[in-house]
Amino acid sequence: MTPEQKARKIIDEKLLTSGWTIQDVKRLNPNAAVGVAVREFPTDTGPVDYALFVNGTPVGVIEAKKSEEGENITTVEGQSSRYANSTFKWIKCDYKIRFAYESTDKLTRFTDYNDEKYRSRTVFSFHRPETLASLIRRNDTIRNNMKHFPEFDGTGFRDCQITAIKTLDKSLAENKPRALVQMATGAGKTFTAITAAYRMLKFGKMNRILFLVDTKSLGEQAEREFLAYRPNDDNRSFSEIYGVRRLKSSYIPSDVQVCISTIQRMYSILSGEETDESIDEISLEEVTSMEKKSPKEVVYNEKYPPEFFDCIIVDECHRSIYNVWNQVLEIMDDDGYVSCYCKR
């Protein structure tokens, strides 16, 4: 098997795992499933490695490359763009190729051409067809929404909280989705994080945020603060506007907007393990020993794919426990990743 054949074999496996039906162009039937990936689909500039159809309409392309090209895979983004702007053979309906992937057997990058100043990012796997269909139905992308947040009303907030929130808004608007918020102990870190979550849900139009903690007590504290929070622009409490749930089992409800979980529970959920509340109880001694342990790996979970959460907020991100369960963060294809910790 050549390196390119090996890469395509693994790409096929990832597509199947992500809910796609794969077809050879000779057996073309783009309406066979919600999502159909067609190999070597002809365009007026040559055949694209994979054409992605959602509900019978072409919406994306995949450029498959051998593993050796992984480190330089961004250099083939021009190829993807060329195919995205090409004319697809046999297609009679109006269509737009909005999504592009470049993939090897080890690395996959993704671009949404509807993003302002779009750029590719690494993703754990391909998005599910239903996810792409949902993105197409939206009025705008989350990343575009985050560029146009209204001015923050800091009435009742401390200066350090106002600075943190405004700086975070600026970071997100500049297409920098990963941010670190460092605040002094007692400065209202969780309150600030909840304010950021509220703004991302209301103005960023996010569907779901994951609030990660490393102990049960921090999760309970965060839950209390979410339930009690009242924004300046609404008389209702946070929980009256958005659903909030602290996870206590292996089930994640899809109808809540904020899920609070320990990172060890989230690892178990993604790994398909049954859990109870005891998994959230980690002693100080265990936390201290985390640095000596090998990082834990997670695999694709069909029920909770990488795009399940639009943002991850990590509480006390400096702690050793995140070194061990770091792949829980890496697997998620999130539009925002906010780390918070107190400087003691």
Show where each model-derived region lies.
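Conserved H-loop
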Residues: 214, 316, 341-342
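ATP-dependent helicase/translocase motor core
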Residues: 1-208, 217-233, 254-258, 264, ...
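Short, conserved "post-DEAD/DEAH" coupling segment immediately C-terminal to helicase motif II
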Residues: 86, 298-305, 319-337
